[in-house]
Amino acid sequence: MSLNMFWFLPTHGDGHYLGTEEGSRSVDHGYLQQIAQVADRLGYTGVLIPTGRSCEDAWLVAASMIPVTQRLKFLVALRPSVTSPTVAARQAATLDRLSNGRALFNLVTGSDPQELAGDGVFLDHSERYEASAEFTQVWRRLLLGETVDFNGKHIHVRGAKLLFPPIQQPYPPLYFGGSSDVAQDLAAEQVDLYLTWGEPPELVKEKIAHVRAKAAAHGRKIRFGIRLHVIVRETNDEAWQAAERLISHLDDETIAKAQAAFARTDSVGQQRMAALHNGKRDNLEISPNLWAGVGLVRGGAGTALVGDGPTVAARINEYAALGIDSFVLSGYPHLEEAYRIGELLFPHLDVAIPEIPQPQLLNPQGEAVANDFIPRNVAQS
């Protein structure tokens, strides 16, 4: 099975070390463009663009990268409860059309009560997933070309429709990650690819089995992906030394503050990440070549595969054997590590190199009439 390898645009900052200004670098449009173009040339399928108050806006970043890339896809966040499903569907179709079918979407429900309150969202964990399920139903139906009337607990629309459909049919693929039961239910019912953070293989196997069974109960099959950092070097010793350098400027106070911030979230996935290390710097290799040091201060994906090219490839193939076909990777700094992974890791894997998409000829159309419908030719009698 050929593997889809994604990279990451670090719109929330980048550098040589975690938790310090030492070795940090400015993340401006030029730098992000460099990373995107390297990923495009090296054959990465796409890039994940993060979301939240600590990041630049993912949609604007993605749109700005379209003209400077040829085949790279952009995995952009959908935020239920923050954006209406109709507006989000319109944005999604536009991004897909402008990128010539290179848009992918990542459903993000949010988990930090403080950040959510700042965004005007005051729903608890279960309510957010209810709202996300309703949002996704409306979003998908709109992109499928339906005119939608929907009267749910959280979402209400009447006569919602899109005038301009997406390039990808039936609609651009929808990704989603979540470890709670309600999250897995949502994935099983509505998404195309379920993402997990990089837990040890036995835990990932268990999670995939649960989601696969839930999807089968709905008569569906979904794909699986995993989010990991990678520290790959020419030798295993060099890779482990690089891992230690990455956290060499971290002090206990910074780790404690980060763990306290993570503790206030209601994310089951974040709780599972934190449990892998419990905020302690010792015993960070939690599974062969799987290192939890990143998660001492980084929210979300907190584990890295560490080793030389053949070793890391072997670990990736272990995950692939569980049914994972998409790997969303990152490394510090992201420009250099995109090259390093392409040079040291990719030759040991069956990487699916995307083709440059051919321009899609959109149907010619006149200006929308009364902002309501597209004029069609009327047969002459």
From Swiss-Prot:
A UniProt-annotated Pfam family: Bac_luciferase
Database matches in InterPro entries: Alkanesulphonate_mOase_FMN-dep (IPR019911), Luciferase-like_dom (IPR011251), Luciferase-like_sf (IPR036661), SsuD_RutA_monooxygenase (IPR050172)
Catalytic activity annotation: an alkanesulfonate + FMNH2 + O2 = an aldehyde + FMN + sulfite + H2O + 2 H(+)
Recorded superkingdom: Bacteria
CDD domains hit by this protein: Alkanesulfonate_monoxygenase
Keyword Flavoprotein tagged: yes
GO biological process: alkanesulfonate catabolic process
Family, similarity comment: Belongs to the SsuD family.
Function recorded in the entry: Catalyzes the desulfonation of aliphatic sulfonates.
Protein name: Alkanesulfonate monooxygenase
Protein species of origin: Escherichia fergusonii (strain ATCC 35469 / DSM 13698 / CCUG 18766 / IAM 14443 / JCM 21226 / LMG 7866 / NBRC 102419 / NCTC 12128 / CDC 0568-73)
